[in-house]
Amino acid sequence: MFRCSRRKLAGVLCSAAAAATLASPPASAATTVNGGDAMYTVSPGPGREPYYCSAGFAILVKDVRYLLTAGHCTEHGLDWKDIGRNVDSHFPVTDYGRVEDPSGSGHSQVDLYDGSTQRILRAGTPQVGQLVCKSGMTTKKTCGKVLGLNQTVNFGDGKQVVGTIATDIPVGDGDSGGPLFYAGVGYGVLSGGNNQVSFFQPLPQVLAAYGATLA
């Protein structure tokens, strides 16, 4: 995850590291994957465990259903168990990717980890100071405030992600790709962070790049 020691974000370049995690797969997977649910790849090889990330928003591109997640989650090219085929990765500079979701159905929803879900009706851009929430497989649903917009983050090895939404929501390994939202509005997908600050790829930019709509 990110290693960002500065809380004052205006004009600050924060250092970062990738945010996928390795773990044993859960016993089963739901037919429809909601935002914030765990995603794990098919086995990358003998003796190696799958990669984990979190699902973002369900989208439609020319009537084909996909799940958004972080681009650094899909850059390995492995398909996702019980979900679908890995489609693409946009990382670095931006940080988003798609996974085919042929068995999914219904509207784009976020797992609130209390037995309920939140339907996402539209994409938007938050205001600095606004209350927002995120959902992820590791830290579940957590909320905080927007600290800044259009933030640049350094992953190391010359890799940067630009234009991110910064929040004070704590995140953990495996949360990458999870949705940033509030009520019925989706704002972004998690690129990374730590227990003090987190950064999200803005959702409107991703939808425009794909020519997509929310499912």
Residue ranges and their predicted role:
Residues 1-29:
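Secretory targeting and sorting signals
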Residues 4-6, 16, 75, 135, ...:
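Residue-level detector of bioactive/disordered segments in secreted/extracellular proteins
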Residues 25, 79-83, 114-115, 126-130, ...:
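Short amphipathic alpha-helical surface micro-motifs
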Residues 30-116, 120-121, 135, 154-155, ...:
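Catalytic histidine site
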Residues 125-158, 171-172:
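Flexible, gly/ser-rich surface segments that form the specificity/activation loops bordering the active-site cleft
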